């Protein structure tokens, strides 16, 4: 906020409203303290840093899904909706922005919900040199698609079963739960759709 004492930059409509209400022009400066909100210039370094951090988070989430597909999920492909990991990364950055150490103090538990059962995929420590100040639990959700269930059933019974491995399709929905490790205040829950 920037304090100004000049009426020259004020909106003429608001000044005329004050004059219509009975204020004299000479008393306007002495009767009121005017405040103008000045939008700060965006810091280009901060914008570039945030975009870079967001892209690193996206890569970490994609690597987690890639590692988990054969080891923990037992599938050959994981189909991720466009921009899902980008939206999650932006929410993670927003939730970490109010923390004492920012994203560096984050430990993220990545899970997948399949038929109302959560399967643990990975634990991501953003900066191992910093004592964690908060935990995020990310829950990806499986797409409720009857075709994929039917397809898995159909191909597993036929001659294609030996070479066919299922494809996991993720929903565009997710859940992100934040728990502060230094506070007794309850968790923050974000449901993405």
Swiss-Prot record:
Transmembrane helix among keywords: no
Organism taxonomic ancestry: Eukaryota, Metazoa, Chordata, Craniata, Vertebrata
Entry's Gene Ontology BP terms: negative regulation of signal transduction
InterPro entries per the UniProt record, alphabetical: RTP801-like, RTP801-like_C_sf
Gene expressing this chain: DDIT4L
Locations listed in the record: Cytoplasm
PANTHER family according to UniProt: DNA DAMAGE-INDUCIBLE TRANSCRIPT 4-LIKE PROTEIN, DNA-DAMAGE-INDUCIBLE TRANSCRIPT 4 PROTEIN DDIT4
Native organism: Pongo abelii (Sumatran orangutan)
Name under which the protein is recorded: DNA damage-inducible transcript 4-like protein
Pfam families, sorted: RTP801_C
